[in-house]
């Protein structure tokens, strides 16, 4: 008899299901192989340097003791806020003022304004008038390789000079920022958020800020200002009251 070839077709749904199942199996196999090559690493303070290398920037910290002629200011940089230590030395001479630390023109002007202000209030602080003709003054900002400019270090320089000529130490845990005028007014500055963060990182307890920056302080998140005693000042008299260990 005649044989007939019988062909049975596989339903399309069944073929698609089989292909999907194969795909899932391949995905599981790939995931298993990937997991076998994956190592879980926990990074903490103990091994952070091993993975990221040495720190690029050293964290500045406040001094251990109150000192004469040394005041911590606050600065804004292109990579955030920073603290700025200003040092003033008084030595025998004839009234010369030496400015070092790569100060820009605006900062040099601020230093001269600060000096003029301190001279104008010398009698109030019982400073002998001839000190400005028989002594030289050296104002220095460390990290001399880094250029520095701007008027916001005015109050810091004025405080450092005042401390140096009176012999009154400055609280080590106080930092400040603000432009100063010849009459001792404290003018507003910019970059306040970054400066406050820098102060907090350095361990500063009290920050002196121009009163006209009050609105900027109000806009800061609580986690930034928490733990800081922020004082609003409008005159150098107030700055001296808060910064000097004993105000005259």
Language-model features, listed with the residues they occupy:
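Peripheral, non-AAA+ core regions of ATP-driven protein-machinery
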Residues: 14, 18-19, 27-48, 54-72, ...
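AAA+ ATPase "lid" subdomain C-terminal helix
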Residues: 1-9, 74-79
């Amino acid at each position: 008899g005649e044989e007939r070839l019988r062909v049975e077709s596989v339903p399309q749904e069944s073929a698609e299901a089989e292909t999907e199942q194969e795909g899932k199996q391949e995905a599981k196999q790939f995931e298993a192989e990937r997991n076998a090559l994956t190592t879980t690493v926990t990074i903490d303070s103990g091994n952070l340097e091993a993975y990221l290398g040495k720190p690029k920037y050293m964290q500045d910290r406040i001094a251990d003791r109150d000192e004469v002629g040394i005041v911590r200011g606050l600065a804004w940089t292109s990579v955030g806020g920073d603290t700025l230590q200003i040092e003033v030395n008084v030595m025998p001479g004839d009234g010369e003022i030496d400015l070092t630390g790569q100060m820009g023109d605006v900062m040099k002007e601020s230093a001269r304004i600060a000096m003029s202000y301190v001279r104008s209030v010398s009698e109030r602080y019982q400073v002998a008038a001839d000190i400005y003709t028989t002594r030289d003054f050296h104002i220095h900002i460390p990290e001399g390789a880094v250029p520095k400019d701007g008027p916001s270090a005015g109050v810091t320089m004025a405080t450092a000079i005042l401390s140096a000529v009176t012999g009154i130490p400055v609280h080590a845990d106080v930092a400040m920022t603000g432009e100063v005028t010849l009459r001792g007014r404290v003018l507003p500055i910019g970059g306040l958020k970054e400066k406050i963060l820098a102060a907090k990182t350095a361990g500063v307890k009290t920050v002196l800020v121009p009163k006209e920056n009050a609105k900027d302080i109000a806009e800061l998140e609580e986690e930034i200002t928490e733990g800081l005693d922020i004082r609003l000042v409008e005159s150098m008299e107030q700055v001296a009251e808060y910064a000097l260990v004993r105000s005259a």
